Curated annotation (Swiss-Prot):
Biological role: Guanylate cyclase involved in the production of the second messenger cGMP.
Topology relative to the membrane: Single-pass type I membrane protein
Gene behind this protein: gcy-3
Coiled coil: none
Membrane spanning stretches: 496-516
Domain Protein kinase: residue ranges: 538-826
Protein name, per record: Receptor-type guanylate cyclase gcy-3
Subcellular location as annotated: Cell membrane
Major localization listed first in the record, in broad terms: membrane
Upper taxonomic lineage: Eukaryota, Metazoa, Ecdysozoa, Nematoda, Chromadorea
Reactions catalysed, as given in the entry: GTP = 3',5'-cyclic GMP + diphosphate
Length: 1140
């Protein structure tokens, strides 16, 4: 038929060459060039999309817009409108009349693919431009050889096919079904033909079309059958629909027919720049970004009740469409509101029945495309006219000017050399608020057919597939389209092969394995024997047994503060921080924990050698436990602790001989290490010099350099480090023995002065400055002051110490030289250190009584502090029984009132604050809340973050006053929040949500190490439900609490029934609001705060159903609850067991 009409074109040309059809010429001036515009329009064909009554107004609006932008200011226009209705015969007749008789300068339309081919062919004979709009996206229309003067603002549907192919390749979908709606202009059929052509292109991703079917919207039975047939053949469906009603019908069908599960993806392909929308209708809601009515809305003022069904179907739909971002949304809104009236006004003056008596309520679907193609013509016309004012119809000059770009009503319009639009497609989806969102761009470089994808998301699961359970659907289900092709279990498929292979493999390796086992048996036994010398199983290290334990599990006792009965080391010492005493083979040993690390053979050999080191001034290394989460070194116990503790924590005097013996022991141990395979200690400090019962110093923590490297040294430890170690940040393996000599000098200065290293209490410098100055060095480097109050100190010893901390390592004496000089300094009159110590202890006992008295005073003071703290943590009665070592039995209370509160939108408020500001805010708020609680005699159970739990009526019963105390306190809370100002957020307001319930409750103490006074019972849970189901700045009461309040305190409070509410775990409950005390209610506040009298019902659906994607009240659109207090763990904690 198409070829017949093309052959008849010359005949129609001669028949109508002398006929002048009736038209409406309009001129806006007589002195400027007047351009004749022929418009081939449609009124009855696809009227909602291309009807002249809903689209024609775009022409004068575009001309008006052009002139505002400085275009076509030198031209006037005459319009000739004929209605061809996309009929080929009418198109030929109208085309001949326009071109031959009226000699128009440009033709707009017709808006159909078949008709515009005819019009474009005629226009080629007369060399006149034809502006295409509407259903003119077929690929052959971009053929410059056939249609050199056809200009469209729609890309070819073939590019839509390449974009869809790229999307399928991205998501690895290789099987699709093609569905399209039947129409009189066969637009979707042509689009699907082009899509099928691109899918068959061997250069594109391999896609199998398993079904291609046409849908007749007028035949509901056939439509259901076609859509249902997809179930057994495909899960990815590409579909096309021209009308918004057809799109909505499709979404309803897939919901009703079960094609809306998480297995199906329905990809709508379109080139109308509207995505999930249709043109805005009066009284309809719109998308926030595009200003269009959501497609699932009813298209008439009378709803059909299927909006939610269509909306559910829309969640399984993705849309490939032209970019719908309009830069000038204000003008688009203006256009939508005025286009229906403009067509009836000059210069178009449409007076047909369709224009005058139109019932349309919105702009036509392709009106924006008509606007953009006229606007494009105006730009090209102005460009060629600006070059030569006398030339505006020379096609050789005019046509190249169409190759341009501008921001139109359909987004960015960019025309290529083929006079067709370079597409910028977008993939649209719906977010969790059912707002249209762009997921990716699919763009084409000029002259290419390969789409370039630019993703707009970083997490595909949450951005694209949130309605599919976060999982991308497969083109072919795992169990097949009929569910009967599920893969067999692994063992059923491969069990026999595995057993056979395993048997062959075992036979092959058995011989080799036996030989290999014999070879390694002796080696393992030898290695095990060697390792057993130093490796200690963790289970052999046992905790010390306490000599006394409390008889009551509720009693409060303090742990012992000493290691043994003879030790004088306090729990706060560095010795106790680093070491722990355990039992090993009936002996007490000293253990130290290190971070776990991988040990190589060299490390293990080192521990074997370390085990064999033995010297009277080295703390014997027994072994290392490596079979737990941490390494634990085991050495002999030195019960008197470290030298650091003895020097600073001891309160007995030391004479020169005592000092000399200690210094000599340190030097002897250091000298032995320097001669051993270790070469040096590397971590010599007064804290690593331990003292045993015989007052003999033993060096510890040597040989653990690999383990200690995992621990970052504190600034205090660096006070003993040599300058060269500080400068180079040397590890133990990089140090020289002279570094130990420097550390020895610092220890000797501590012993002589009995002050901490560098005497930081008396110095102005801190750790950082001293370390910096030691590292800096210089001619007069900083060193500790040696000022001792011991009268008989040998000056030679002081000189030796100063030699040991010389700046240059080579200037320091060796450890062996130090020992020789110390032997020469040995006092002749002294026998041994133990005799000397016994004499000193006799002197020490004289000061013991004074110390005991001072400690007794300190103990009394601390006991008062502990009692005060305990009274704030637990009720007074409970605290007294616990202090007495008595068991606190659970106690039941027949009637109490439980109070829950929560700060509304605390997460949003906290996000605007720094952590310190959040802490200060809660501290200011809760400090005043605590004052209010004390005023009303209410017991504060706990505060969890921004939540509060209080109770009245326990542990001291108060009759029925508990409901009054809680209500009064709640009102005081609300009054305080009204006047509470956040210093750093003066515009923000703190609002509370309060829930109250009255009933029986059980209270008792739970826990041993940290006892808590806990509440148990359904009354607590129900109070929590009241808070979570309450509203901001309102006090929510259960019916039990309300009845108690009204019965015992009538006419004192104003309340209002909220109605029946579905409470999780409780069913339907009638609840009440407390508005205030009688006579204190302001009308404005009452009207603002009191909810409607109408009954509310809330429904919470199970999270695994499609309906659970939102929680809403009747009549409201789905929304997400962003309240941070609805976290499940938080709610569970508050509802089940609430502790302080």
């Amino acid at each position: 038929m198409k070829n017949v009409f093309q052959l008849l074109i010359p005949l129609f040309f001669h028949l109508f060459s002398l006929v002048s059809l009736q038209n409406i010429p309009v001129s806006t001036g007589t002195t400027r060039p007047k351009l004749k515009v022929g418009i081939a329009a449609a009124q009855k064909t696809q009227s909602a999309s291309i009807g002249w009554n809903v689209c024609g107004g775009a022409v004068p609006l575009a001309i008006e817009r052009l002139k505002q932008a400085g275009y076509v200011t030198n031209f006037d226009f005459e319009y000739y409108v004929e209605y061809t209705e996309c009929d080929l015969a009418s198109t030929v007749r109208t085309g001949i009349n326009f071109l031959k008789n009226l000699e128009v300068d440009v033709i707009i339309g017709p808006p159909c693919s078949e008709a515009i081919r005819t019009m474009a062919t005629l226009a080629t004979l007369y060399k006149k431009p034809v502006l295409g709009w509407g259903f003119v996206s077929q690929a052959d229309l971009s053929d410059m050889t056939r249609f050199p003067y056809l200009i469209t603002v729609l890309p070819t549907s073939q590019t839509l096919g390449y974009a869809a192919s790229k999307l399928l390749e991205l998501y690895k979908w290789d099987k699709v079904a093609l569905l399209y709606y039947k129409s009189e202009v066969n637009h979707c059929g042509g689009v699907m033909n082009d899509v099928e052509t691109t899918f068959n292109d061997p250069s594109t991703y391999s896609i199998q079309i398993v079904l291609k079917a046409e849908i007749d919207a007028s035949d509901n039975v056939t439509t259901n059958a076609v859509i249902s047939s997809v179930k057994t053949r495909a899960r990815i469906i590409l579909w096309c629909a021209q009308l918004g009603s057809e799109k909505r019908d499709y979404m309803i069908k897939i919901s009703q027919l079960g094609l809306d599960t998480d297995e199906y993806v329905h990809v709508l392909i379109s080139m109308r720049s509207i995505g999930f929308g249709v043109q805005t209708f009066v009284g309809k809601t719109t998308f926030k970004l595009s200003g269009l009515t959501p497609v699932w809305e009813s298209f008439s003022n009378v709803t059909d009740g299927l909006e939610n069904v269509a909306k559910r179907g829309a969640t399984n739909v993705l849309v490939i469409d032209l970019n719908s971002e309009v830069s000038d949304k204000a003008y688009l809104d203006y256009m939508q509101r005025n286009i229906l009236n403009v067509v009836k006004l000059p210069p178009l003056n449409c007076s047909t029945v369709d224009c005058v008596s139109s019932t349309a309520t919105g702009m036509g679907a392709y009106a924006r495309h008509l606007f953009d193609v006229v606007y494009l013509y105006g730009i090209a016309l102005t460009r060629v006219n600006s070059t030569d004012s006398a030339v505006y119809d020379d096609m050789s000059k005019l046509i190249p000017q169409f190759v341009t770009s501008f921001n139109g009503m359909t987004g960015l319009v960019a025309i290529n050399q083929n006079l067709s639009r370079m597409p910028l497609y977008q993939l649209y989806g719906l977010d969790e608020q059912y707002e249209q969102t762009s997921l990716m761009n699919l763009s084409f470089a000029d002259g290419t057919t390969v789409a370039t994808i630019s993703l707009a998301y970083s997490n595909e699961s949450s951005a694209v597939w949130h309605f599919w359970g976060g999982i991308r659907p497969l083109a072919t289900p795992i169990c097949g389209f009929l569910g009967n092709s599920c893969p067999l279990p692994f063992w059923e498929q491969y069990g026999i092969l595995i057993f056979v292979g395993a048997g062959v493999f075992l036979i092959m390796i058995t011989t080799n394995l036996i030989c290999f086992l014999f070879m390694i048996k002796n080696r393992r036994e030898e290695q095990a024997r060697i390792n057993s010398e130093w490796q200690i199983p963790f289970v052999k290290l046992r905790e010390l047994e306490r000599k006394s334990k409390g008889t009551s599990k509720r009693s409060l006792q303090s742990a012992p503060s000493t290691i043994t009965g003879e030790s004088k080391v306090s729990t706060g010492s560095e010795f106790c921080e680093n070491y722990e005493v355990k039992m090993f083979e009936k002996d007490m040993v000293l253990t130290m924990k290190f971070q776990y690390m991988n040990l190589n053979k060299a490390d293990m050999d080192k521990f074997v050698k370390l085990r064999k080191l033995d010297h009277e001034n080295l703390n014997k290394f027994i072994g290392l436990s490596i079979d737990s989460s941490q390494f634990i070194s085991v050495t002999k116990l030195c019960s008197r602790g470290s030298l650091l503790d003895i020097l600073y924590k001891g309160n007995f005097s030391m004479d020169f001989f005592f000092m000399y013996c200690i210094i000599k022991d340190v030097a002897e141990g250091m000298s032995y290490l320097h001669k051993s395979f270790l070469r040096l200690h590397g971590n010599l400090r007064s804290a690593t010099c331990l003292v045993n019962d015989s007052w003999q110093v033993k060096l510890a923590e040597f040989g653990f350099d690999q383990l200690l490297e995992e621990i970052t040294p504190t600034k205090r430890r660096l006070l003993w480090a040599a300058p060269e170690v500080l400068r180079g940040s040397l590890t133990v393996s990089q140090m020289d023995p002279s570094a130990d000599v420097f550390s020895f000098a610092i220890i000797a200065s501590e012993i002589l002065t009995r002050k901490e290293a560098w005497d930081l209490k008396e110095r102005k410098e801190g750790y950082d400055e001293i370390i910096y100055r030691v590292k800096k060095g210089g001619s007069f480097p900083i060193r500790p002051d040696i000022i001792t109050d011991v009268p008989d100190v040998n000056p030679t010893l002081i000189a030796l110490v100063k030699d040991c901390w010389a700046e240059a390592p080579e200037d320091r004496p060796t450890a062996e030289n130090i020992c020789e000089q110390l032997r020469d300094l040995m006092p002749k009159t002294k026998s041994n250190l133990m005799d000397h110590v016994f004499n000193m202890l006799e002197e020490y006992t004289s000061t013991l009584e004074v110390e005991v008295e001072e400690r007794t005073k300190e103990l009394t003071l601390e006991k008062k502090k502990a009692d005060l703290l305990l009274s704030r943590m637990l009720p007074k009665q409970v605290a007294e029984r616990l202090k007495a070592g008595q068991t606190v039995e659970p106690e039941g209370f027949d009637s109490v009132t439980v109070f829950f509160s929560d700060v509304v939108k605390f997460t949003i408020l906290a996000s605007k604050c720094t952590p310190f500001q959040v802490v200060n805010l809660l501290n200011d708020l809760y400090s005043n809340f605590d004052t209010i609680i004390e005023e009303h005699g209410v017991y504060k159970v706990e505060s969890i973050g921004d939540g509060y739990l209080c109770v009245s009526g326990l542990p001291t019963r108060n009759g029925f006053n508990h409901i009054k105390q809680i209500v009064d306190m709640s009102l005081k809370f609300m009054d305080y929040c009204k006047n509470f100002k956040i210093p750093h957020l003066p515009r923000e307001r703190v609002e509370l949500r309060i829930g109250v319930n009255s009933g029986p409750c059980v209270a008792g103490v739970v826990g041993l190490s940290m006892p808590r006074y806990c509440l148990f019972g359904d009354t607590v849970n129900t109070a929590s439900r009241m808070e979570s189901n309450g509203k901001p700045s309102l006090i929510h009461l259960t019916s039990d609490a309300h009845l108690l309040l009204m019965k015992h305190f009538p006419h004192q409070y104003e309340t209002n029934s909220r109605g029946e509410v579905i409470i999780k775990g409780k069913g339907v409950m009638e609840t009440f609001w407390v508005l205030g005390r009688s006579g204190d209610i302001e009308p404005s506040i009452s009207n603002r705060s009191t909810p409607p009298v109408t009954q509310e019902r809330f429904t919470v659906r199970a999270p695994d159903t499609p309906e659970a994607r939102s929680v809403s009240s009747h009549g409201s659109r789905p929304s997400s609850n962003h309240n941070n207090n609805n976290d499940p763990l938080y709610r569970q904690y508050k509802m089940d067991t609430l502790k302080i």
